[in-house]
Amino acid sequence: YTNQGPFQNAIKIEKLENNQVRVHYAVTRPAMQEKGMVFELASSAVRETAGAFTWEGKNVRAEKVNVHFMHGFGWLIQMSENVYYKDCNLMPRENSGHLTVSYADGIHASGASGEIVIENCNFANTHDDPINLHGTFTRVEKRIDSHTLELKYIHNQQGGFPQYHVGDKVQFFTRDLLSSTDGEKQYEVAEVISNPGENGNDLRTMKIKFKEDLPENLSDKIGGQPKYVAENVTYAPKVTIRNCTFRNVPTRGILCTTRKEVIIENNVFHNMSMATIFLSNDSNDWYESGPIRDMKIRNNTFYIKDIGRTSWEYAPAIYIHPVTKGGQFPDASNPIHKNISIEGNTFYMDEDTVVKAESVENLTFKNNKVFRMNPDVTVGIALDNKTIQAGQSVQLKTDAKG
């Protein structure tokens, strides 16, 4: 994956014979270019449509479906219950000359309930994450009265659909620490006064009334912006991702944040360009929500290799990195994520890190095999600012052979 496309720093393009062009550069051609590399040119990078759109659906199943090209997003899920994908292939057609299956994510859930099951599927050549499953934070713009809030989608690629329904349960978190200030109390939606696009609202703004009295501090600001975000915890699915393969992806393999049980098992990941499994919870950039409470990553195989990444500082096999306003995390007594088990996996490491984790309680790394595919890769564990060498122990221990 590289941002150094053929037109970076180009000053002139000259048309030649036999479908050839000569590109003139200001200084030198991009360093990442090598003979045999293939570049694709897209006339539009706008994600203006989805290959398949499931909205407020229930018990949706896709089996034995082959997808070879989707113009924008892939399969998009919003506010739906129980969605299943089995024996599906999201890959370019072999020997077709085409190298892209979608210009964005493969399977993307922005709010789901019940369960999402993805098994025996193959993903390749998506221009974004093959699987991205999350809720959506709406920002608390205004506490209208003791029961009513004005909420808003913030990211410019979110909006235009209802986020809340009567009876849904909602929790509030601070944007600076992703912490609850009321013991993660849940508030029940009593009335949807107006959805995005209704009653004079723009496509991102909604007004919601709750049964319970709302805390006065929901009006607080931080850095001149609203301090709190709201998450619809009713739309947090149980997730199973099993027996899938991932390859030729310029971003991550799996993103998943939900408070329900998550099992990621028996999958094979071939050389993702960024973090292979990325676990976030984000109150400032994409507003993709979900504190993890029970996740098992087991019996998977990871191949981690340098393939020319230029956009991320870190690209470990598993990267647990919440995103807050200001970049700070709560103290160890109140972590953002809890109970993540990494067991029985095999890692083939050519570069980077097996696991990089921030703000997690009860992180278990057990019975995994790590193979060094590059003799320059070092083996060790870093805990806060203290690095533990192979064979040493503080609260953790690492041993290496070969």
PLM regions: where:
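Short glycine/acidic-rich loop motifs that flank beta-strands on beta-rich extracellular proteins
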Residues: 49-51, 71-76, 93-105, 127-133, ...
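Leucine-rich solenoid repeat scaffolds
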Residues: 357, 361-402
